[in-house]
Amino acid sequence: MEQTWRWFGPNDPVSLDDIRQAGATGIVTALHHIPNGHIWNKDEILARKTLIENKGLIWSVVESVPVHEEIKTRTGHYSQWINNYKTSLKNLAECGIDTVCYNFMPVLDWTRTDLEYSLPDGSKALRFDQIAFAAFEIYILKRPNAEADYTVEEQAQAKVYHDNMSAADIKKLTTNIIAGLPGAEEGYTLAEFQAQLDRYKDITRDKLREHLAYFLHQIVPVCEEYGLRLAIHPDDPPRPILGLPRIISTIEDIEWLTTIEPSPANGITMCTGSYGVRSDNDLVEIIKHYGNRIYFTHLRSTQREENSKTFHEATHLAGDVDMYNVVMEILREEYRRKKVGDNRLIPMRPDHGHQIIDDLKKQTNPGYSCIGRLKGLAEIRGLELGLRRAFFENK
């Protein structure tokens, strides 16, 4: 696997020098300062690429070129936004960058209720609490008919949870959910957030699928012409939230995706932390069946709790994700490609990381502290080395 690292640009507290010292060779980044929907021009792309290469690294993957909300709802100026997207893809390809991660999640990127969940060893992790989220939806946001998405028991627990919240607790939970996280590109006030949700009130799962299919049919020919690889990121969490449809959450969704647009340019990001939240997602089977469409991997693990919809982020080799067999299957896919003349490694980044050691004293991007990811990368690197030596070299 190609060892990569997500970098949020010049303002990231983790520097390119730090990343190189961590042992990564590839950078995963985006032009976060460009508003969603606007064209990434070549000057901007080359400036970022040069900055990376001057530190002895390469820009391996774009994460992400954000998809404008009007493309997802297929309203307003969606045609113009798609044309802009095509131009950005073309410009990236002509600058020598050929792998683009993106997502089609309505309104929000990845969502958590707690960005500083304390673990028994004193480290901090990201957490999604189903009951806290229910309290937010029902009693803070007051989304119409939100109760229908929760069991009677969950509703009762949410009421108790909300009744025990202080004003500061409510503000913090609201901020965690709607203010935007690294990669989300946009943040919202409560009123703005509800207005964004309302834009989807008539958009069903099937309708959102139709909109993604239309988008792919428009951009895949550009990818084919310029040798680009698309890698859609799964929903996080991988289920409907806030009354919004989610369409990239399961192996059945991947089957639909690759059927409606069979071009090899239409690929996936194998995010084990997102898919792995669902106990009915067999990660190894996903890799076995769709390995030829995996162009990017995010390796992390989560731990489901007593309420199976509540989870926190585990260390990279622990939790519910069988990282041993996941990495084994990724290596099998790499060797399969090698046999047919494709020697390119699959880009992998250690996704998220606990806030540990000296980073506990620093201001860090939630999930993207340096030392936690350094630890995760080292663990995965060691696992890969052991598997390669034991099962693949000279065989």
Swiss-Prot record:
Keywords: Iron, Lyase, Manganese. One of its GO terms (molecular function) is ferrous iron binding. The keyword Lyase applies. Its cofactor is Fe(2+); Mn(2+). One of its GO terms (biological process) is D-glucuronate catabolic process. Its EC number is 4.2.1.8. It catalyses: D-mannonate = 2-dehydro-3-deoxy-D-gluconate + H2O. Pathway: Carbohydrate metabolism; pentose and glucuronate interconversion. The keyword Manganese applies. Belongs to the mannonate dehydratase family. Catalyzes the dehydration of D-mannonate. This is Mannonate dehydratase. It comes from Photorhabdus laumondii subsp. laumondii (strain DSM 15139 / CIP 105565 / TT01). The gene is uxuA.
